Amino acid sequence: MSHFFAHLSRLKLINRWPLMRNVRTENVSEHSLQVAFVAHALAIIKNRKFNGNLNAERIALLAMYHDASEVITGDLPTPIKYHNPKIAHEYKKIEKVAQQKLIEMLPKELQHDFRCLLDEHYYSEEEKALVKQADALCAYLKCLEELSAGNNEFIQAKARLENTLAIRQSPEMDYFMAVFVPSFSLSLDEISLDSLD
């Protein structure tokens, strides 16, 4: 008997942004799905508009599993995780142990297939960068949603993420930001009316 998927199903019980007041709580499971949507889109944009040659479906899968180890480690708040390089380095080691523990929950004949999704050492540098871009973009989108709902708790997080996005900047991310991101600050009525035109 394997407990792998029973563990993954508990990602929905782990809340993100645990030290901040949220208008709407976000869990790791729904965050992972949004990161998969965005990473998939970034890969397609890169391929279609900027001469990329990425497997968009693989990118989506990598994004789906990118935070799977948090079912064991929990979601450590960013200010703590990146407080200094030593903490960040040690946390990476903890994540690696958690990834290995998840992999060992699988039947032996499936372990390699999932190791390639759970362990970022199996990602190409381009795949890793794209998933990190999507992850940061989704955190930024969360900030926009919270701010548009009147929650000023996310002002500093938004500023920090703008710096992160500037560092991870790419043509496909610029395209996504210009075409898709503005809608996240609009109401349902505004995006619905615009869609009917």
UniProtKB/Swiss-Prot annotation:
Enzyme Commission number(s) of this protein: 3.1.3.89
Domain of life: Bacteria
Alphabetical list of Gene3D superfamilies matching this protein: Hypothetical protein af1432
Cysteine disulfide links: none
Cofactor(s) named in the record: a divalent metal cation
Cross-referenced PROSITE patterns: HD (PS51831)
Pfam families in the record: YfbR-like
Site feature (Appears to be important in orienting the phosphate for catalysis) residues: 16
Domain HD stretches: 28-140
GO cellular component terms, semicolon-separated: cytoplasm
Alphabetical keyword list: Cytoplasm, Hydrolase, Metal-binding, Nucleotide-binding
Coiled-coil region(s): none
GO MF annotation list: 5'-deoxynucleotidase activity; metal ion binding; nucleotide binding
Reactions accelerated catalytically: a 2'-deoxyribonucleoside 5'-phosphate + H2O = a 2'-deoxyribonucleoside + phosphate
Localization, UniProt: Cytoplasm
Main function: Catalyzes the strictly specific dephosphorylation of 2'-deoxyribonucleoside 5'-monophosphates.
Protein family according to the UniProt entry: Belongs to the 5DNU family.
Name of the protein in question: 5'-deoxynucleotidase YPTB2590
